[in-house]
Amino acid sequence: MRATAIALVAALLSVHLWADARGARALRAAGKLGASAAFVAVALARGVEGALGHGILTGLVLSVVGDALLLSSRRAAFLAGLGTFLLAHVAYALAFAGVARPSAVVALAVAAITLAVLRWLWPRLGAMRTPVVLYCAVITAMLWLALGVDRPEIRAGAALFYASDLLVARDRFVRPGLANRVVGLPLYYAAQLLLALAVR
């Protein structure tokens, strides 16, 4: 199942990126939402178990909604997508909190990275400073808790998700361009597939 899921997501993501490069909006949306639906399907096929599994599934479903909203370049859609992904990270964090053994040292390290990212973004954020800071706080907490879970797929998935969001931020606030999505989206879908595999 893993190989099939990876192949399906890779194919749909390739369609999305190809369409994005050519301005084919309908195909771009279909490829991205198809790839996003696939990671939810993987979780359901695995069989969702316990508070951890249901929390992860909630995060995955919210992520699909966020992906749909972020297909638009409008500021309102970006804010709505940011809010939806914030809720997804809350769901992940709550799921991980029940099984994590968090480390204060890891908390300091992750917080230091996030502060460096915010310093990099700060001059470019303008009116988006408050929502971006709030989002960064939540994803930092999510990553910290994930790194305290004794499940390699959860640790790797959370770290890749965090890394992919750096590319989203670069695309939105620093240097927009397809290159951000060519690098960032594979990281994002790898992250979500890893988390989907952790539902049981």
Residue positions per predicted region:
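Polytopic alpha-helical membrane-helix bundles and their juxtamembrane interface segments
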Residues: 1-200
